Amino acid sequence: MDNKIILLVEDNPDDEALTLRALRKSNVMNEVVVARDGVEALDYLFGERSYSGRDTSVMPELTLLDLKMPKMDGLEVLRHIRADERTKLLPVVILTSSKEECDLIQGYSLGANSYIRKPVDFVQFSRAVQHLGLYWLVLNVAPPKVMMAKK
């Protein structure tokens, strides 16, 4: 599991810390890149602004995407991810506290691979993150990197 990058897109520092703690507690030792808003997430993925020197042929194995964020919300980020040849096959899991059915429907309509509501209880949250890591980083077969790196 350990050389696959996870992109965590989360604006809430408490939720970021909980997610990172839950990943470590679940023995997910992958590198986690944190983007604190939607614009930063896209900058990372496409190697723009502060990420202009990043090797964009190296894409995350998994993106954990919050929905309610400043600058650009998660649904708009997802729209951009799916519209670009380099990232359209990138596994994206929406990890949000939103209980709005319209977010769920729109997330899947825009191409989310999964939609997980963050449990309030840390033990349940840790368990959810453990299952998430096991499935997406161990069991799931991701698209070939060659397909995602093409532009």
For the regions a language model picked out, list residue spans one by one.
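Acidic, metal-coordinating helix/loop segments flanking the phosphotransfer/catalytic sites
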Residues: 18, 24, 33-62
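Receiver (REC) domain active-site loop signature in two-component systems and cognate sites
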Residues: 67-69
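C-terminal output helix
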Residues: 40, 120-133, 141-146
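Conserved acidic segment of CheY-like receiver
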Residues: 4-14, 19-24, 63
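Short, glycine/charged-rich "phosphate-handling" switch motifs in NTP-dependent
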Residues: 113
